């Protein structure tokens, strides 16, 4: 222990317990070792990785689907290759959970989220939507993003089940 102490009730009065679950999962391996709660690292992992990289995918894409397409997803994907790559990691993620390699899963899921964010950054739906001729394309790109977001969220369900339950209840997903 390095002087980091807080009362569990105090934490629960101010923060979602799933943030702590996510943080601990990002630090847990299948070995027996102490985990130091570093509040700066905690804040960075939750804000940057969980919210900034993963949750933001859903937020970025849902905004377009909701506002510009009346909550209607495209009938087909634009980037099947990236979607298939996300799905192909399922067995490795399951195995990591079975082997209690939680931090390995967080790294893998975060790297997959990085790929999705890179795709969205390259396709620039916020620019493409300005041209009416690109509306169908933007709908497909955002459908890609939401589908991949839902898969990534599913991969995190053992760690943040309440958050994922809320995501699964969103009608456009």
Model feature map: region roles:
Residues 78-86:
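Membrane-interface interhelical connector segments
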Residues 4, 35, 85-90, 148:
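N-terminal alpha-helical segment
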Residues 17-21, 81-82, 130-132:
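Generic detector of short, locally flexible boundary/turn motifs and exposed helical patches
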């Amino acid at each position: 222990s390095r002087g980091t102490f807080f009362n569990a009730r105090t934490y629960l009065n101010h923060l979602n317990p799933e943030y702590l679950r996510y943080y601990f999962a990002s630090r847990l391996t299948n070995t027996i070792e102490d985990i130091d709660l570093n509040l700066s690292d905690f804040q960075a992992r939750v804000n940057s990785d969980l919210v900034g990289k993963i949750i933001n995918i859903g937020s970025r894409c849902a905004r377009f689907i909701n506002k510009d397409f009346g909550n209607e997803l495209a009938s087909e994907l634009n980037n099947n290759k990236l979607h298939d790559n996300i799905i192909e990691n399922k067995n490795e993620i399951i195995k990591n959970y079975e082997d209690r390699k939680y931090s390995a899963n967080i790294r893998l899921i975060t790297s997959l989220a990085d790929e999705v964010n890179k795709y969205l950054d390259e396709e620039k739906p916020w620019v493409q939507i300005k041209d009416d001729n690109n509306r169908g394309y933007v709908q497909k790109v955002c459908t890609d993003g939401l589908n991949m977001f839902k898969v990534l969220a599913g991969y995190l369900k053992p760690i943040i089940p309440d958050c994922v339950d809320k995501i699964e209840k969103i009608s456009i997903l």
